[in-house]
Amino acid sequence: MSNHQKRLSVPNSWPVERKTATFTVKAGAGPHGESGVPLLIVLRDVLGYADNRKEARYALNEDNVLINGKAISDEERPVGMFDILAFTEREEYYRVFPGEGGRLALTAIDPDAAQSKLGKIVTKTHVSGGDVQLGLHDGETLIVEDDQTYDAGDSIVVGNEDGEVVAHFEYEEGALVTAVDGAHAGEVGEVEEIQVTPGSAQNNVIVSQDEGEGFETVEEYVVVIDENFTGDDE
């Protein structure tokens, strides 16, 4: 199977120029599904820390590139929304955040913020033993005690080292959200109204912003965040 993908066919979330070359690297198996961006693209095209695959592999073999607290050696490992990237040798830390047009962008954060990551709950399932399994937006799962306060659509912050929930943001009117897809990707505002749609169609969400502006999008495209997640300057 080819390790390359045509640039014109890559997802909109990939931060690559589509007309500069015919092919780009293909994402390997891992979290985030089709929207995951290969780590090589982040190192080469976004940060400029490597000129090619060979240089990226050399850097990764030094074990000082971490994603969500774990050292990564695979340059094709997918990187996606709200992942935490740490470059320990450089003492640089980033959170992956939606940028304009839905392209993934890196927001600089401080070392303390890099100790945990945000996850949107997309599924909630009762498992044997009376516990609950939460499925997150990136495909990861988390077992928690049976707690009725967690619902699909909520967001949680999970510690990278111990996997414990350190914060919980409910999806409700008044919540601070960001759009991660669609025409308003990267925009931030407060949920003004959740319009419940009968049947299998998605609910609509009206989001208000400063100075009377706002936007409307589908529920799937919004993620509840804390104000610290819009940008953490060191």
Swiss-Prot record:
Residues 37-99 form the S4 RNA-binding domain. InterPro entries: Rib_uL2_dom2, Ribosomal_eS4, Ribosomal_eS4_central_region, Ribosomal_eS4_central_sf, Ribosomal_eS4_KOW, Ribosomal_eS4_N, Ribosomal_eS4_N_CS, S4_RNA-bd_sf. Keywords: Ribonucleoprotein, Ribosomal protein, RNA-binding, rRNA-binding. One of its GO terms (cellular component) is cytosolic small ribosomal subunit. GO terms for molecular function: rRNA binding; structural constituent of ribosome. It comes from the Archaea. GO terms for biological process: translation. Gene3D superfamilies: 2.30.30.30, 2.40.50.740, RNA-binding S4 domain (3.10.290.10). Belongs to the eukaryotic ribosomal protein eS4 family. PANTHER family: 30S/40S RIBOSOMAL PROTEIN S4, SMALL RIBOSOMAL SUBUNIT PROTEIN ES4. This is Small ribosomal subunit protein eS4. It comes from Haloarcula marismortui (strain ATCC 43049 / DSM 3752 / JCM 8966 / VKM B-1809) (Halobacterium marismortui). The lineage of its organism: Archaea, Methanobacteriati, Methanobacteriota, Stenosarchaea group, Halobacteria. The gene is rps4e.
